[in-house]
Amino acid sequence: VCSSDLNNYMVKDLLTPDYIFEASWEVCNKVGGIYTVLSTRANTLQTAFRDKLFFIGPDVWQGKDNPLFIESDNLCAAWKEHACEKDNLSVRVGRWNIPGNPIVILVDFQSFFAEKNEIYTEMWNRFQVDSLHAYGDYDEASMFSYAAGKVVESFYRYNLTENDKAVYQAHEWMTGLGALYLQTAVPEIATIFTTHATSIGRSIAGNNKPLYDYLFAYNGDQMAGELNMQSKHSIEKQTAHYVDCFTTVSEITNNECKELLDKAADVVLMNGFEDDFVPKGSTFTGKRKRARSVMLNVANKLLGTNLGDDTLIIGTSGRYEFKNKGIDVFLESLNRLCRDKNLKRDVLAFVNVPGWVGDPREDLQARLKSKDKFDTPLEVPFITHWLHNMTHDQVLDMLKYLGMSNHPEDKVKVIFVPCYLNGRDGILNKDYYDLLLGQDLSVYPSYYEPWG
């Protein structure tokens, strides 16, 4: 073996951790894109690290059945008892119900609210994190993050030694506080902070300001004050500066980090999917056929139509950010298409965007159970689930403004599905990625797109 090969081997061995801890608000908690990022690469990580890979998430499903979490009384039983009795931590340990089934530690962080002011003071004194302007979800995320850091500290001191190489990866500003805590509490643990977007970049874009044209001119701290985002921006920025390694998910987001956080990423870690993420061959064909059948059946029962399998099915999806995700552009484009006299083919468009959802429509459920065909539409024939804010919803408001009411003569029909497609929504009852296979075209006209 030549010396260069030996050096390469030693460096690789030095940089390969023995244990990985990954913290995110979306572990066993499907909220947005980060859930997809973590869950679709967990299988590869699990294969490489086996049960030395630990995901840490918030225990927000207490008292309810969480289908994504398989609790185990045997996993880490001795440490769990120690964490409870000696470290005053409340955790549940189990497996994430995804390919690879990695170990998950869910943290009950409610007890830390009593120490909130002391925690924020500590973070200001050590890292200049400004929590004075906290509101909304900042406190909840911060207490979870701090608790997650405490959990990793407890696990490390109970199970590991200074010879074990451990890495803590914190995803998004919601887990920054825990990474900063570990920087001083357990400096032996290497800390990584990954931002999948920037809070200020998203807010600038969401407030109808030209982000990309004038990115070079924005000052992140100034914009945080203007947009009332001081605390979220502060934890994001200070974590990026103080952790051992700062990463982001794309070059375009790295540009945001340089300009708005005053810190370029040390590494750009682009997201990807497992090789088998998209089914192949007959499996793909079968799933696509079943998905189209479900979507067309729901549409026909809702609209009182008889749309056939030659219907062009298109869709968009994402978090409910009307401009950032291009929902406005999508609807306007459909409206123009609907007015095109040369359009001969039926078009069925789905807007799969979780809103303030109430219950699945009972009248639609009744029709779906029936084998009869219907030639009259239901009331409000463009939504599958009732909303709590039916009179103040941006999608419904724009459909009304555009005059898109799914008339029988319209070649373009639009259906708003305002819920998470987890297979148990009460109407479509299929997972999002299974339904996606049934679409002929997926459209994502985002204005703000960090590729995160």
Where are these regions (language model features)?
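Catalytic cores of nucleotide-sugar-dependent glycosyltransferases that transfer UDP/GDP/TDP-activated
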Residues: 4-452
